Curated annotation (Swiss-Prot):
Sequence segments annotated as region (Disordered): 1-20
Transmembrane portions of the chain: 36-56, 85-105, 116-135, 179-199, 215-235, 268-289
Gene that encodes it: SLC25A51
UniProt-recorded name of the protein: Mitochondrial nicotinamide adenine dinucleotide transporter SLC25A51
Outcome recorded upon mutating T205M: In a breast cancer sample; somatic mutation
Protein family per UniProt: Belongs to the mitochondrial carrier (TC 2.A.29) family.
Domain of life: Eukaryota
Length: 297
């Protein structure tokens, strides 16, 4: 119920012990889910990067949408896609792991652990999200390149990585705690709710209808999760915009932002409406592209 349409198309498990494990072994060995996740991420980043930049400025400075857009206009078209390489590398890698590892780990846990499917799927989702966090340095560099305060310090991904090197390996993983929390819980909700949501949509009878349903399903989930985890991303962005100095805890940074924004919840969610629409489009594209590629590859 909680698995994707690709799960439903797997060969049925037979009673013979020899035949019982072969579908799972075959699925674990496949790279299709990794490739589809990678391509879906590339498609998404290329389309939505300018929107993400506006959102980033709002998260970091607490400014309005119009002011963030004006900042980007002043930066010029030349800088519009500045910093796209880290998210492109990060998203293609992490989404490949997110979809691929989830499928593989779900099969392995289901085979070796006598627990309800929702439990094994949940554990697989958390483990996939935790593995994604290995690539935190890419998200870290993306934050620095998008922050106009650092424009004069480095102009490309290589220079940004080099600037962090002198501060030690820990500097690359600044902001790891909120990323681990966000990845694990959001993966559980995404994979757990994707199936039930699609089941409640009108039955698709054509390829285009399936594509629309997959877009709606992914978009609704992405928008909901993007809004739910927005404050965590605000804190994560603030933590990762710093180079060197004290490693401040999540509660400490949250308290500082809370005071800066007059202790008003609405100010903490400044930019959330744009994030909602970006996530709606972004995860709609990701889910629709992923499911489409699963059928054609």
């Amino acid at each position: 119920m909680m698995d994707s349409e690709a799960h439903e198309k797997r060969p049925p498990i037979l009673t013979s012990s020899k035949q019982d494990i072969s579908p799972h072994i075959t699925n674990v060995g496949e790279m299709k889910h990794y490739l589809c996740g990678c391509c879906a991420a590339f498609n998404n980043v290329a389309i939505t990067f300018p929107i993400q930049k506006v959102l980033f400025r709002q998260q970091l400075y607490g400014i309005k949408t119009r002011d963030a857009i004006l900042q980007l206009r002043r930066d010029g078209f030349r800088n519009l896609y500045r910093g796209i390489l880290p998210p492109l590398m990060q998203k293609t890698t992490t989404l490949a792991l997110m979809f691929g590892l989830y499928e593989d780990l779900s099969c392995l846990l289901h085979k070796h652990v006598s627990a309800p499917e929702f439990a094994t799927s949940g554990v697989a989702a958390v483990l996939a999200g935790t593995t994604e966090a290995i690539f935190t340095p890419l998200e870290r560099v993306q934050t620095l390149l998008q922050d106009h305060k650092h424009h004069d310090k480095f102009t490309n991904t290589y220079q940004a990585f080099k600037a962090l090197k002198c501060h030690g390996i820990g500097e690359y993983y600044r902001g790891l705690v909120p990323i681990l929390f966000r990845n694990g819980l959001s993966n559980v909700l995404f994979f757990g709710l994707r199936g039930p949501i699609k089941e409640h949509l009108p039955t698709a009878t054509t390829h285009s209808a399936h594509l629309v349903n997959d877009f709606i399903c992914g978009g609704l989930l992405g928008a909901m999760l993007g809004f739910l985890f927005f404050p965590i991303n605000v804190v994560k962005t603030r933590i990762q915009s710093q180079i060197g100095g004290e490693f401040q805890s999540f509660p400490k940074v949250f308290q500082k932002i809370w005071l800066e924004r007059d202790r008003k919840l609405i100010n903490l969610f400044r930019g959330a409406h744009l994030n909602y629409h970006r996530s709606l489009i972004s995860w709609g594209i990701i889910n629709a592209t992923y499911e489409f590629l699963l059928k054609v590859i």
